[in-house]
Structures are given as structure tokens and as C-alpha cells.
Amino acid sequence: MKKTPLLNSQVSQAVATIGHFDLLTINDAGMPIPNDERRIDLAVTKALPRFIDVLETVVTEMEIQKIYLAEEIKMHNPDQLKAIKGLIAEDVEIEFIPHSQMKEYLSHPLNKGNVRTGEITPFSNIILESNVTF
């Protein structure tokens, strides 16, 4: 059995294939994720699993250089924004973009996976951009 915190095989496989500048998204239940091979649906019911719990686990296995968040999270979900900032290393760049642009990244060529959680709070979506470990 795997010794690290991330047990889901699909999420683990997506992280394992990531190279420098590649992307992984973690999303709330309402994000319109394309139904393709990159879709990883973890949602069981409302709020299960929570976005922040999935993010907390993924960051243990992924070297991140930059994150993208919806500009709208500042006004509509400041508690989630605070929680995200608490999990992300201080040297990681944060870029705020319109939510409509976040949706475009779901099909971006560098995107290795779109994780759907059971999160039901607004704008609980993040794009993680990979760094190298050396």
C-alpha cells in the first residue's frame, strides 16, 4: 500500500505525469468539467469530499510554482481564499483571473487532470502549475 497521503489512483497518476509548467485543476461540484480522459470525479455528495481537503492532500505530492484563482473568490468566498493561502507555500505566485478564464484552462493542452470535489461553496476552484523539485 502507498505510504504517502494521496491514495486515489487517478489523482496520483495525474500528479505522477506532471512536468514543469504542467497544470492540474481542483474544482467545486458545479464547475463544468469536460467529460474526457482528464476528468477525475471524486464527488460523493454535497461537501464530500471538501475542496480544501483534496487540495491539502495534493500539495503533499506536487511541487507548485504558481496557482490561479478566480478573481471572484475575493468577494464571494474569502474564507476559502484564506484557507487556500494557508496551504500554499509563501514563495508560490498567486494570479487572480476571471472565472470564465478558469473554465478555459479545463481544456488547456498542459492540463493533466481536472479533479471534481463535492464542494458547494462558490468559486472553490484552483489551477496548480507545476514546478521542478531540483
Swiss-Prot record:
Record flagged with keyword Protease: no
Identify which top EC class this enzyme belongs to.
Answer: isomerase
Where is this gene product found? Cytoplasm
**Which EC numbers characterise this protein's activity in its record?**
5.4.99.62
Binding, substrate: 28, 99, 123-125
Q: Which Gene3D superfamilies match?
A: RbsD-like domain
InterPro entries linked: D-ribose_pyranase (IPR023064), RbsD-like_sf (IPR023750), RbsD_FucU (IPR007721)
A GO molecular function term, named singly, is: intramolecular lyase activity
Describe its partners and assembly state: Homodecamer.
Q: Which family does it belong to?
A: Belongs to the RbsD / FucU family. RbsD subfamily.
- Its name, as the record gives it, is D-ribose pyranase
The gene from which this protein is expressed is rbsD
